Amino acid sequence: QLIDPVTELRKWCKKIVHVHGKDATIDWDAVRHGGISGAVPFVWHRMPGFGDTNWRDIISILRSNGYEDDICIEGYHDPVYNGELEMTGQLHALNYLKWCRGGEFTPTPWEK
């Protein structure tokens, strides 16, 4: 449906208690030629970092609204990193999401 996840996240962020990390690559040529109901597939579900989603914005919005829990990476549906490559894709996605949040977690010494 081509709904912008960042716009929706801003509306619903205060109600979120669990996040699944999933990305998508849109084939805009297929959309322009056949629309989203055309005979040609226009979207491929990917692991975070391999699609079009702006994960830096998503993590910033989540954190600025108090979300402190995990992001569960979904990868079994990725057309590239599946089967024996799924764990490789999962690790790439994990490292990418860590980068998006600003790197490794380092607690502030004066905060409890």
PLM segments and residue spans:
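Histidine-acidic metal/acid-base catalytic patches
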Residues: 1-112
